[in-house]
Every structure is written in structure tokens, then in C-alpha cells.
Amino acid sequence: MSKIAFRMENICKSFDNGRVKANVDVNLTVYENTVHTLLGENGAGKSTLTSILFGLYQPDSGKIFIGEEEVHFKSSKDAVQHKIGMVHQHFKLVDNYTVLDNIILGNESSFSIPFTNGKLKLPLLHRKASEAKIQAMMERYDLHVNLHQKVSRLTVGQQQRVEILKVLFRDSDILIFDEPTAVLSDQEIKSFLNIIKNFKKMGKTIVLISHKLNEIKEVAETATILRQGHSVGTFQIKDTSIDEMARLMMGKELKETKNNTQFTAKGEPVLKVENLHLYLNQNWFYKLIARWNQKRINQLQKQGKPAKTLWLKSWLEGLAAIEKTPRFIRGIVNNLGFGSQQVFDKGISFEIHKGEIFAIAGVEGNGQNQLIDLICGLEKAAPKKVFFNGFDISRYSIRKRINAGIGFVLEDRHKYGLILDQTVRFNAVNNQIDRKQFSSWNFLNQMQIAVYTNQIVDKFDVRGAVQGTAIVRLLSGGNQQKLIIGRELTKQNELLVFAQVTRGLDVGAISFIHQKILDAKKQNNAILLVSYELDEILAIADTIGVINKGNLLEVNKRDVMTRERIGKLIMQ
């Protein structure tokens, strides 16, 4: 039998003065050169347990052994010294730094010179030495990324590779991955699973937290179940079916949630998007010129004149294409988006009616985020592009859209959904605090807020809320998501916009949220669902549109849009 890599005995950890018990007498043993997964519902204590192993939290009681040595970690620095590394669900990267700087941050190589009693380190970074080590790691583990690119310009999958390289750069032998595939596309997930297999071949020990049971079945050997903070058993993956794993994790049988209705559009649309252009280049100057150009073309067409590209746009594109253009000027033009940037002038158009779930399928990075931003008001569209109940809301503020009856659950819940250092109660009403139900004459009605919050907590099973008094940061990621979804589904909205709504949720919570979305459909809400999970779209959508490179290629009924058809459109 393999040697024990580490074991944790009778680990207890609580928060909020003991009111939230995250781990209760948890035992975990993981062997060297294995992939061991932690399974459990949202809030079961998985992330807390691994955070204790990585030194981010100190246990209230219990023991940790690395091999046969008992250790006491006061910080993550102590864990790193024992060759433990962790890749968090929410990446810990500095966006404005390069990949190289992010990898070496906190573990920099420096120049040194011979001195009387050894070597004297100079306050100068030895970047070439660090870069050479990282290049060798990338070749060895087949983890390639541009070291000189800024992190802000990387895809989510590439950012994850940077996090993995950070861990490897510190020579970690025990690697912890917390929900590593929650934000990845299908292709990136395949790549990640291959990385895990390579790590095992090279002798690494992997601890994997994931709710995606098919992925666990592919790479893991053993699993430990956590339920409400307790460890309830360990089993061999190869001897256990996916259905059985789900039952063990939830403690009950799961019912399939599926949209079995046939939708027929009636009346005027709730949301109408008309010839909306998605400029995938993030540069504000490019968007300004592109929209100015489109406006001019529309005016010429109305006047019956031939369409002509704006002279400034043509000139900038010409500079990028001409070989005689000085390199530094061409570089500036390319950075502005007028070189290799491909322009898509077709425009997106679709309608969503009452009682309809309209889903948008596609690989991440094809314009989904831009579309959501324009509908929700994070970005302003050109006039007469976005209509809600017949009113042009293209230039409405976010507040005005919320007051009109639009609710949204956006992909980045920490940035757009929650104020992490406030209570559950505050977050339950923070975008509707001006309603008479919750405040009058600038005084908050704390009783009504508490009652309303408790309804959301009970109805949506938000665990660890402590009757709404808990700080949101202390909730698990899945329970944070359930709080946001509960808030938006409890409000009187006519349009609900969901982006990656089940990201990071366990299988039971996913089924529960799907049912709540179907209930909202029955109540005649119009629903826009943007998801990278094809199974989710096929299970609950009425109408499916496929987005590719900023264009909506096809919109059709669920019965027509088979998995194969959607796949072909995505790959075009």
C-alpha cells in the first residue's frame, strides 16, 4: 500500500463565535500519488477543511500529520514549506501583472554575490533564472502560457494554468484544487483533467473538490463524503456509480428536473433585442469608432445611399495592414483593436415572451458577457437596440432597469451580486432597500427585513445564514449563490437574466434551482439563461440560440436544437 501523504484527525472549526459549525470531528486520510476527492453539498465544510490543510484557517481542535510528522500551520507560508499548494475556486491573481510576475510573486529569485560568511542577496530580481525554471515546468507538465502577457488579457482557463504554475513553482507535492472546473469551458475541462492525470503519473498527490461527478469518475480513485460538517465515509470511486455517488453525497435520491412543456409565444415580447452589435474588443476607443461607423452606415442606408465605412476606421485598419507602417505605430493600432480584431456587423436580434426560457449556448468568450452587460446596463447600448415591455431601455441606468422589473444573477457573484462584508439580511434587500416594505423616512424596518430574509433563507436552503445575521463572506460559494438567486426570484420581476446560475453548485442544489426557474416560468416570467453547460440548457430551455464570435447563428425550439446540432454551430 502507498504511504500516507497526510491525515487530519478530529478536525473541528466554527465561525461567528461558534454559531456556524463548518467542520465537526472530521477525519481524512490521503495516500501519496493518488487523486482523492471531497464530496458534499454546498456548505458541507469541504473548502474549510482544505483551507485548514493549507494554513489559511487554524482548527479549533484536532491534529494534522504530513507523513508521520504532526504539524501546526500558522499561515499558508508554513503549508508551502511542507510542499502543499492550493488552487482556489476564485483565483488569487493580480490582473495588471504579467504571468511571470504572478507566478514568482512572494517567491522571487534574486541576485547574490560571494560574501565573508556565504552569499549576500541583492535587492534585484533574477527574472531570467525564474523564467528558465518556469519554461522547464511548462514543458514537463505540458502547461503552456505566454509568460509576458498580462493576466487581465487571459481566458479563465489560461488564468487557471497560471495558478497551477504558481503552485508548481513552489515545488509542491500535495496539490489542492477547489472547484477547478466550475468556470471552464468543455475544452478547457478536458485539458484540465489531462493535467491531473499527468500530475499523478509524476508522483503528485491531488485533493480535488468538485460537484461534477462524471469528472470525478474519470480521474479520482477515492472519495470522502462530508455532510453538514461531518465526515460520513470514504469509498473507492471505481466501485461506485455516478447515481450512487449523488445519493451518498445528498443522503437521498435525486429527482430529475426537466422542462416538459411546449412553449407557444403569445402577445408582445417582454424583452426585444434588435440589431445589437457586440464588439468583442474590450477597448473603449474601438467601440466608440465602431458604433459611430455603424450609425453612419444606418443613416446612409435610410437615405438610399451606398454604405461607406467611416474614413477614420478605414485609415486605422489600413495602417495595420500596410507593411511599411513603422512597427511601433502598427503595435499601437493593433492594441486599439484595428489590426487582427475581426469585426462582426450582422448584429444580434431575438425576442423573449412571457413564460419563456430563452437559453444562449456557446463556448465562453464569444460575446455572452458583452450581451449580458448591455441588457443589464453595465454597458450602454446604442438607442433603440434593447426594449423591455415596448420601452426603449438601451440607455437606462442599472437602477432604472431594476425598478422597471428586471432581475439579474450575473456570473461574477462577488463583483456584482453581493457585498461580502455585510450580513445576509443586508444583501437580501440591498437592491430594493428603498421599497416602503423595508424603509420609510430614511429609517429601516428591521423587523420586515428579518422576516423577508428568513423567507429566502428557508425557501432556498441558504445554510450558515444564522437567521440572516451571518456575514456573507463566511458562507460557502454555493450558499452565496443561492442567496442571490433567492433574492431575485422572490422579487416581483417580469424579466430574469441568469448568467452561469448554477456555477459551483452541488447536484442537489442544481436540481433545486432548475425547479425554481421552472416555477418562475409557470408564473409567466420571461427568462434569459446564459450557460456553458449544455445539459442544463437542454433540460430547462424552451428556446435555444447559439452564439459564436459575437453572432447569434441560429434560434430555434428545444426539440429542434439537438446536442449534435448545437455542437456543430458552436464549432463553426
Curated annotation (Swiss-Prot):
It is a peripheral membrane protein. Its main location: membrane. The keyword ATP-binding applies. One of its GO terms (molecular function) is ATP binding. One of its GO terms (cellular component) is plasma membrane. Keywords: ATP-binding, Cell membrane, Membrane, Nucleotide-binding, Repeat, Sugar transport, Transport. It is found in: Cell membrane. ATP binds at residues 40-47. The keyword Repeat applies. Residues 6-253, 327-572 form the ABC transporter domain. PANTHER family: CARBOHYDRATE TRANSPORT ATP-BINDING PROTEIN MG119-RELATED (PTHR43790), GUANOSINE IMPORT ATP-BINDING PROTEIN NUPO (PTHR43790:SF4). Belongs to the ABC transporter superfamily. This is Putative carbohydrate transport ATP-binding protein MPN_258.
